Design a protein with these regions (language model features):
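Hydrophobic transmembrane alpha-helices and immediately adjacent juxtamembrane helices
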Residues: 1-211, 215-251
Length: 251
């Protein structure tokens, strides 16, 4: 099963390699601007948040945001472009590559984009700050970042499969994806919400992702329930992505 998926993934990685410099500049600019404006520019006015400097509080969230947003965007636009413009998906279907392999390949591509771009932002942020983390903290953080990127990559495959107009894809990102990211405690602790809303926000897998990733990287904690929530959601969305893509291709 993975031989065909790996071939498609390798093709997408070769495309990324050709434009890696421009991609890195573009992807680093936005989170770095936010970090400089809020993390450094306003840290004197905000003070400590959950016992840590505000610039440290938002750093893991910005890295995670970059990774999952890149994973989602790559999966969505790559699949849509190859399905509606280049018709590469139709070319894949006349080869011995099975439908699940195409889905797995696109998920792997989005996932890889997310990790590479998240790493780039992390290196830049760590280069301009005095904050350092132990390798064990980083391993705990990756336990959230990897399934989180896979989750958003699977969601991107679903959007790229069912949506035929690029403006619709843009609306979904603006109305659903970005609010889910920003509402999950990226810039503020969940305690800022009214007590009646907190349980609903905590039920979101994105909250488990961002809160768990922050705890893992900053304090070395590992909230098992949050990690399981992210991983189980990723598996469910993956199954949905395969089913929806197979259904779409059978039309």
């Amino acid at each position: 099963v993975f031989k065909g998926a790996f071939a498609i993934w390798r093709r997408d990685m070769l495309v990324l390699r050709r434009s890696i410099l421009s991609e890195m500049v573009a992807v680093v600019a936005y989170p770095l601007t936010i970090y400089l404006a809020f993390g450094i520019g306003m840290k004197g006015y905000i003070g400590l948040v959950d016992g840590v400097p505000y610039s440290l509080f938002i750093a893991p969230g910005l890295i995670t945001m970059t990774a999952v947003n890149a994973a989602y965007s790559e999966s969505t636009w790559s699949l849509w472009f190859h399905r509606k413009v280049q018709f590469t998906i139709e070319s894949y279907r006349v080869t011995p590559i099975a439908v699940p392999e195409i889905v797995i390949a696109k998920i792997m591509s989005g996932f890889s984009h997310g990790l590479v771009k998240g790493l780039a932002v992390g290196l830049v942020i760590f280069a301009i700050t005095p904050f350092r983390f132990s390798p064990l903290h980083l391993l705990a953080y990756l336990a959230f970042l990897i399934p989180g990127s896979a989750l958003f990559s699977c969601a991107g495959v679903i959007c790229g499969t069912v949506m035929d107009k690029p403006e619709t894809i843009g609306k979904v990102e603006a109305v659903f994806i970005m609010p889910l990211i920003f509402m999950s405690g990226l810039f503020f602790p969940l305690s800022s919400y009214p007590a009646t809303i907190v349980p609903w926000v905590r039920a979101l897998p994105t909250t488990a992702l961002f809160e768990g990733a922050r705890q893992a990287l900053v304090s070395g904690g590992f909230p098992v329930v949050s990690a399981l929530q992210v991983a189980i959601t990723a598996v469910c969305v993956f199954a949905a992505a395969v089913w929806i893509f197979r259904l779409k291709m059978s039309e």
